[in-house]
Amino acid sequence: MSTSAGTPTSAHAPLSIAPASTPHQRSLSVKPLAAAPSPAPVTQCSITSKEWIVPPRPKPGRKPATDTPPTKRKAQNRAAQRAFRERRAARVGELEEQIKKIEEENEREEAALKKTIQQQQQQIEEYKSQLLWWKNRCKAVEDELMTEKVAKEDAIKQLERINNSGRTTNNGNSVIGGCERCSSTRCQCIDDAFNIANITQMQTDDPHSKRGRSPSQGATQKRHRSNPEIKTEPEDLETDFTHSFSLRRHSRTGNDATTPILLDPCGFCQDGSPCICAEMAEDQPSDRSNQPSQLTKLPPIQNISQFTPPPSEGDVLSKSATLVSSNKSNPCANGPGTCAQCLADPRSSVFCKSLAASRASTRQEGGCCGGGGGKDGCCKNRSSGSDSSKQATSPITLSCADTFTTLSLHPKFASASNELSNWIPQLHTLPNPQNLNPDRRRDQNLTNRPALEVEAASVMGVLRYFDRRFADSK
């Protein structure tokens, strides 16, 4: 085992120092320093040239790998693990196939649902378009319906106007009101209202009468109470003048003085009472053809101020000052409320009937001449009244139609229409000339007048009554 140090071959040959039991371990070899200068030969020293291989240090905590022969248990474990890995790989493959199938089914269902949704959306769009069309159609039908309604209303209004115009032009005894007791000449409601008002006034005036009543007045009132006034319709008062006119036409060649006088019923004279129109016509038959009407000789209405105080601010006399009665003949030949104005205006008809009823009730209450002992004349002061009437100026009068027109111009006439029984008696009509002689009638200009006229002074008094009565109302 000894080698010489001087031989170069022995210097480069490695020397293994590892034990024989560990052939796999690396040996630590130490190479000689060839480049180093060789030292001077020292005597009695030996230098080894063997290469030593040092094994690597094992890592801490781990056993060193040992090549042990495989045993039966390990072989079984390895086989089991191998089989497990194979089964697991097969299971994974199966699951992947199932997943693919599920995904395909899901895609098919999703495609079907998308197709259904698309169809539903198309149907919704169609339904929306149909709904819009129906809305437009409904709107068009509603417009047509409104047009038809308007046309129907216009036709109904036009028919009503035609019916109303036919009613106004009809001169028959059609009932204007709704009480079924009124005709075109008389209104039972108005007569009853004035009779009740007169009875109440008589009861209140009896205890405070200033003078006693004459026996003739008492007998007259008792007679009127015991025998109620019988009101007949205009048809019962009609008279056939056909033969009279024919006789008058044949006798006109003879003496005019023997010509019979034919009169139309005035409508204000009642059955059993003297008629002012008939008396005036009998007294002066010749004045009717030779002399003009006395109404044209009356002073204008502007001169009312010299008989009555000046009107108040609410009076509307200035508007009606130029109204002069143009009806020189009797416009209400068939009775009160039968003239053209009364037929055209129901308020005028009610006013005319109320005035006629008030005049009739006043005539029943008063004395023999209807004045009641006042300024209109009575039995006791007939002589003095007849003497003074010749010297006095004839009063200014208005026709019934002009009176209504004058009063209706007052701003409070609508409110006053509900209180006719309070102010209608204040309108003074012409005195009842049943007991007047022909000279007095001629002096008082009572010939050739309409059947009913109202004093202008009393009209002014009623206008002032409206101002006082409705001063606070707005």
UniProtKB/Swiss-Prot annotation:
Gene3D superfamilies: 1.20.5.170. PROSITE patterns: BZIP, BZIP_BASIC. It comes from the Eukaryota. Keywords: Nucleus. InterPro entries: AP-1-like, bZIP, bZIP_sf, Hap4_TF_heteromerisation. Residues 67-108 form the bZIP domain. Belongs to the bZIP family. YAP subfamily. Iron regulator crucial for the adaptation to iron starvation and iron excess, but is dispensable for virulence. SreA represses the expression of hapX and the siderophore system during iron sufficient conditions by an iron-sensing mechanism, while hapX represses sreA and activates the siderophore system during iron-limiting conditions, resulting in efficient iron uptake and inhibition of iron-consuming pathways. It comes from Arthroderma benhamiae (strain ATCC MYA-4681 / CBS 112371) (Trichophyton mentagrophytes). Residues 1-10, 287-307 have a biased composition (Polar residues). SMART domains: BRLZ (SM00338). Disruption phenotype: Leads to reduced growth and decreased conidiation during iron starvation, but not during iron-replete conditions. Showed a reddish pigmentation of mycelia during iron-depleted conditions probably due to the accumulation of iron-free precursors of heme. Results in a lacking activation of the siderophore biosynthesis genes sidA and sidC during iron starvation and in a decreased production of extracellular ferrichrome C, but not ferricrocin. This is bZIP transcription factor hapX.
